[in-house]
Amino acid sequence: TLKVYNMSILTDMFGSIAYREALKGGEGINTPHINSQQEVYTAMLEELELANSLYNASLGLDDPTKDGIYGGDIAKWQKFTNTLRLRLLMRVSGRNNAFTPTVGEQINQIISNPGKYPVFESNDDNATVKFSGSAEYYKTYFNSSSFPDDKSLSSDHHIAAQLLDLLYDASDGFVDPRLRIWIKPRYIQYPSATEPDVIREMIGAVSGCTINYNGITSISEREPYLHYETLVGDTRPNHMLDYDELLFIKAEAAMNGWISGSAKEYYEAAITASCQKWGEYGIYASYPELNASNKIELKTVAITQKNIAALLASDQVKWNNTQQRLAEQKWLSLFWVIGFQMYHEMRR
């Protein structure tokens, strides 16, 4: 399973790679044959089918503590395997007939037979790498050293306009509840108790351009930045593959007529799962809010069912039966999932 997971990132990034003869240096194969991307995908799907048949939930690991993803839970590894297979199938769904059985037929085969092909059922099944937060075990994918807060780092990681524009619209007051988990606005705190503090309006950075491209002359003015306390704290996990992505896959499969069920219901369940996943990070937040005296207080964040219902009913998010709306929200849900998944999803 992990071999396919890692090799899928390589082929999605670079196309043709060594696969069938790769990782065989011990057998004397030092110059492995390069396979086409279709050959790689065919082989990866075959290996995930094989892996599914090999997992035995009645057996455990001799030392479950060595498993930093599922703690030796074999049943969850099997769910991860089949959900990963669905990710890869949907990624090549534009070439439906290039595979035998077709992509749609394989997706239907998995989803319609949960007894043989169990998949993620909740956020409890998410594939994440956990970190203890001590010594070298705080160095996550996004965190090369211990960064407990945003001190001296807020100038480093600005939020792109493409992301911010899906989360925030000042013209009508739209704010995705996940924004306060992922992003912090610029703010000014004055020492005087009578002088009001200021929270800046948020304007996203234009990717690939200088900081003043959008008319801002100082990074301290309006460009928001990553919410370090929630995202790169020393014990925050790496997300590899999550339940919300599975639900988006089901929504797209339903739109394509490959599986039964309502695309709208799968879509709304996906966004709900994403919000619930990120809501758990709110206890680490340090988000600026103005109190009754117009002074800033840094607070934790909660995402309530009311917040989620309002999000699903908003003009920016509510289901409109289009691939664009589905693609935008799936792309957004892949924020902070490792392996360049937002990029791969956009390219497909």
Residue ranges and their predicted role:
Residues 274-348:
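C-terminal functional modules
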Residues 1-282, 320-323, 329:
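Structured, solvent-exposed acidic/aromatic patches
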